[in-house]
Structure formats: structure tokens, C-alpha cells
Amino acid sequence: MIRILGEGKGSNLLEDVKEKLEEIVKKEIGDVHVNVILVSEDEIKELNQQFRSHDQPTDVLTFLLMEEDVYGEIYVCPMIVEENAKEFSNTFEKELLEVVIHGILHLAGYDHEFEDRKSKEMFEKQKKYVEEVWGEWRSDPSEDSGPGKR
């Protein structure tokens, strides 16, 4: 199960694709609870400093908790996601899916900093899942879904 916490840009999209994200969590990790928390630039900078000793904001941070009620948390800063989307010529919505799915894969044990084989596998899975979720979301015929509806 995924719980979306925080409001603002991106929360509607994440609610729209929540079931699909839950399928990815179930496939990669199992039947666990994951929180996706939307935070400000200041909040993510503080978390990045506290837990990674990086004195700058980032787009996503993932914490494996393995507690009874919450397996892990994915902190996302929509402002940084938006900056990255512009830098990579991506839409905000697709970039947001990239970072949330990236976080899910970290919770599943994938790492891209040290292991080349696992890193390649992680990014291949990330690309596959993003395309699946993006394609399904864009083809949703409801009035409230699709690019530009956020």
C-alpha cells in the first residue's frame, strides 16, 4: 500500500497512479506499506544534510524503515523535480514518476552508486516502469487525467 503525504504540485498525479505504483511495490518488495512524502526545498535540504552530509536540496531521498506499519519512506521535493524536468527536457509529471519509481527500487534493494550490474538493472527497470505508468496515465479517458490536467 502507498500513502501519499503532503500537498501541492504532483499530489494529484500520484493519487491518479497510486494503484499502478502499488503494483510495482508489490512486485519488487512484497505486500508492504510505503509513504511518499512531498516536501519543500528547505525540508529536503535538511534531510539531505542530516542523513547524507550533503548541504544542498535534492529531488528524492529514500529511507528503509522496515517497521511493522511502514516499510519505507520516499521524500520528494516537487520544486527540484520541476527544475530537473526542465534541465532534462522532460515534463514535470514524467520526471515525478521517475523519482518515485527510483525510490521504490531503492527500497527494493537496488543501488546505483557502487554496483555496475545492479545499477544497470535498476535503471532498466525504472525506465520500463515509468513507461508503463506514463502510458497508462496518458491514455486514461477521464477528464481529470493526462498531461496538462494538473
Swiss-Prot record:
GO terms for cellular component: cytoplasm. The keyword Metal-binding applies. InterPro entries: MetalPrtase_cat_dom_sf_prd, YbeY, YbeY_CS. Zn(2+) binds at residues 102, 106, 112. It is an enzyme of class 3 (hydrolase). Its EC number is 3.1.-.-. The keyword rRNA processing applies. One of its GO terms (molecular function) is RNA endonuclease activity. Keywords: Cytoplasm, Endonuclease, Hydrolase, Metal-binding, Nuclease, Ribosome biogenesis, rRNA processing, Zinc. It holds the Pfam family YbeY. It is found in: Cytoplasm. PANTHER family: ENDORIBONUCLEASE YBEY, CHLOROPLASTIC. Single strand-specific metallo-endoribonuclease involved in late-stage 70S ribosome quality control and in maturation of the 3' terminus of the 16S rRNA. Belongs to the endoribonuclease YbeY family. This is Endoribonuclease YbeY.
